[in-house]
């Protein structure tokens, strides 16, 4: 028989740098999860992706055990990295803060494909282009 799920926790953590400090500690502590065990397992699995922020979905079961799924980095993070920016525009559509090429958009779309609700690469590219526009990043050919 399957274990009963008591909670699902969604966090965005830097790869290989999860610590018991907030936001990890309080989020897991209130569900009775062994925080150090999660940190060790997460850091071991993400050590090769250093410097990236990764969304993680932690499923907590009735017996206080847990499993977690690491997703692809947020599109906004990948776009800022591609454009060489620290943050997006404070006034998107009015103030353009960076540029990315169609080739970069395609690479990001390929990376994000498993997590996007898109059937084709073209549809995924349109989603990423929309994210870029909302951040004040211009898409050039």
UniProtKB/Swiss-Prot annotation:
GO molecular function: large ribosomal subunit rRNA binding; structural constituent of ribosome
SMART domains: RL11
Post-translational modification summary for this protein: One or more lysine residues are methylated.
CDD domains, alphabetized: Ribosomal_L11
InterPro entries reported for this sequence: Ribosomal_uL11, Ribosomal_uL11_bac-typ, Ribosomal_uL11_C, Ribosomal_uL11_C_sf, Ribosomal_uL11_CS, Ribosomal_uL11_N, Ribosomal_uL11_N_sf
GO annotation terms (biological process): translation
Domain of life according to the entry: Bacteria
Subunit structure: Part of the ribosomal stalk of the 50S ribosomal subunit. Interacts with L10 and the large rRNA to form the base of the stalk. L10 forms an elongated spine to which L12 dimers bind in a sequential fashion forming a multimeric L10(L12)X complex.
Protein name: Large ribosomal subunit protein uL11
